[in-house]
Amino acid sequence: MTIQERDVAAITDVDLSHAVQSDACVLFTGDDGTAEALARRLHALSGWRHGPFIAVDCSLPDAEPRLLQVLDVENAAIVEGATRPRLAQAGTVFLREVGKLGPGLQRRLSERLATLKTRPGAERRLRRRVISSSSVPLDSRVQEGTFDARLFYRLNVIHMVISGHARGW
């Protein structure tokens, strides 16, 4: 799906309906601010809306410990005001600029996503919907060998491309 040449505010719930009906990972490629607005809207419309929406900026130097905290409830510390009980809830994790992760963390994230239970109320320890964004096309980074192919395919279950003409909310 390509979202282009119109305000993100004009994007209807119908545009997100396929992703709302699924618990699969979603990857937004394009404008980062727009991607986060769409991720928040998707969270609000989904079965995960009763849990927290936790954003992790993968381009920041402290991305690794923050990402590991959100994906490992057992060892979780405070992340962006999310206390341990809040992290234990089923919710949505938004990985902003996931393409900026280093190779080691890409591999670890891929392994963690392989064990992730992606249903609200799931019995496994970690219950999260993962939505990610990248301002660069990750498929070309996979072709270049600079992005982990397994992680790309785990994140790219539902892919939405945001044109440079779209404007954030």
Which residues does each predicted region cover?
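Nucleotide-binding/hydrolysis machinery
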Residues: 4-14, 20-24, 30, 34, ...
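Surface-exposed alpha-helical interface segments used for non-catalytic interactions
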Residues: 40, 107-111, 149, 153
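Short alpha-helix of the ABC ATPase nucleotide-binding domain corresponding to the H-loop/switch region
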Residues: 68, 106-107
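Conserved Walker
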Residues: 76-87, 92, 98-105, 111-128, ...
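Conserved post-Walker A coupling segment in P-loop NTPases
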Residues: 14-82, 86-94, 98-99, 162-169
